[in-house]
């Protein structure tokens, strides 16, 4: 199964025409999916049951819609107060979602499915309420490899074959998106990530520091940490994830199925607020700049504004002298195309979990996606 030209993806996505997707994705009279609306109507009121919610996030550029929903007051407009809660690792986000310390999270798409199926950790029924962003991740390799001629995947494969030493690559969570992008890219270049390399898990904000001290040869992570590695002169961008799969799904708004059942109106209100923030971010250059200035602060990503702002505007450099304007940079709304939680997206992550041995047998792909993605 491949991201590009996947028949399953094409079939399911083309079954929803543009008008249907925009109706589902745009804040309006209903604001959220039919599944959530049905729960709301059963309750007889649309007032949020829980007025204050904690939403966990990892310091990454794509936490922006959660943060800006709070900062810009979109949450209050929908009758809730969002408290963005900075977390240290994806494992911590998982654990706090499962035990109820967090109500929602900005979270890796594949992580939600891993928890739902109990892969390498606790099992709990989960829910994806919306997709938070497309694109905007990358694979960074150490500058030391470029000095030896490994400036892309093919060059890396040749160098690994010649040196015959153990190579170490990092991703951010075993069932997460970054692991899947890394594995897919390595395999596409003839490198078996399960046999030909050592793969470790490192939280996103620690990637650059770990590469600086030589703990890994490369990593896959979200921005701004790939650009930060270039700014610090220790790494270069071997590929962006949008070059692997244009407009791929990335982070989602995740919660437990139990929370949605207990607080359907709150789930509706939070989804609507973050959707409105997503639209606001993508509306203008000025909004993106303000967003970058906000999330660069210590309470959120804690990095320089330039580390965020360049790639959020599509201004890329690879750290080896190449610069380009990428029209497929990180998007939060993109005229409503980003946010619908396609069943086919969830199913694709399941196929990759099976491909890399995280799932030992084939699940009912469609049934699992229907259980998790609230459409």
Identify the function of each model-found stretch.
Residues 62, 93, 111, 178, ...:
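Stable alpha-helical elements in mature extracytoplasmic
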Residues 43-201, 210-230, 234-247:
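Short, glycine-/small- and polar/acidic-enriched structural segments
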Residues 13-14, 20-42:
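N-terminal export signals
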Residues 1-16, 20:
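N-terminal secretory signal peptides
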Residues 139-140, 252-255, 259-260:
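Short glycine- and hydrophobic/aromatic-rich loop-to-beta-strand nucleating segment
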Residues 247-248, 290:
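Short gly/pro-enriched beta-turn/loop segments at secondary-structure junctions
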Residues 101, 106-109, 116-119, 143, ...:
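Sec/Tat-exported extracytoplasmic proteins
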Residues 262-374:
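Secondary-structure end/capping motifs
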């Amino acid at each position: 199964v491949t991201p590009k030209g996947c028949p399953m993806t094409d079939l399911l996505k083309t079954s929803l025409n543009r008008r249907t997707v925009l109706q589902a994705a745009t804040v309006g009279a209903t604001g959220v999916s039919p599944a959530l609306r049905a729960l709301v109507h059963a309750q007889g009121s649309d007032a949020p049951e829980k007025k204050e919610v904690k939403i966990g996030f990892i310091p990454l550029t794509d936490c922006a819609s959660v943060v800006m929903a709070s900062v810009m007051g979109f949450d209050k407009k929908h009758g809730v107060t969002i408290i963005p809660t900075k977390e240290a690792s994806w494992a911590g986000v998982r654990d706090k979602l499962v035990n109820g310390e967090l109500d929602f999270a900005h979270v890796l798409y594949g992580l939600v499915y891993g928890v739902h199926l109990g892969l390498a950790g606790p099992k709990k029924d989960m829910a994806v309420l919306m997709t938070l962003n497309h694109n905007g991740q990358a694979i960074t390799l150490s500058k030391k490899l470029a000095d030896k001629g490994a400036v892309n995947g093919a060059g890396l494969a040749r160098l690994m074959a010649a040196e015959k030493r153990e190579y170490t690559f990092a991703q951010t969570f075993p069932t997460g998106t970054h692991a899947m992008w890394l594995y897919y890219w390595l395999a596409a270049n003839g490198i078996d990530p399960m046999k030909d390399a050592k793969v470790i898990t490192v939280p996103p904000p620690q990637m650059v520091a770990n590469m600086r001290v030589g703990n890994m040869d490369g990593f896959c992570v979200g921005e701004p940490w790939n650009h930060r590695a270039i700014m610090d002169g220790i790494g270069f961008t071997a590929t962006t994830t949008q070059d692997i799969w244009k407009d791929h799904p990335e982070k989602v708004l995740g919660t437990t199925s139990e929370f949605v059942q207990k607080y359907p109106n709150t789930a509706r209100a939070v989804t609507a607020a973050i959707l409105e923030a997503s639209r606001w971010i993508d509306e203008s250059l000025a909004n993106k700049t303000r967003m970058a200035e906000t999330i660069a602060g210590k309470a959120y990503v804690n990095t320089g504004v330039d580390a965020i702002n360049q790639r959020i505007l599509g201004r890329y450099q690879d750290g080896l002298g190449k610069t380009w304007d990428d029209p497929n940079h990180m998007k939060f709304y993109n005229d409503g195309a980003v946010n619908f939680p396609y069943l086919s997206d969830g199913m694709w992550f399941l196929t990759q979990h099976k491909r890399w041995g995280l799932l030992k047998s084939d699940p009912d792909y469609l049934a699992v996606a229907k259980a998790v993605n609230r459409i």
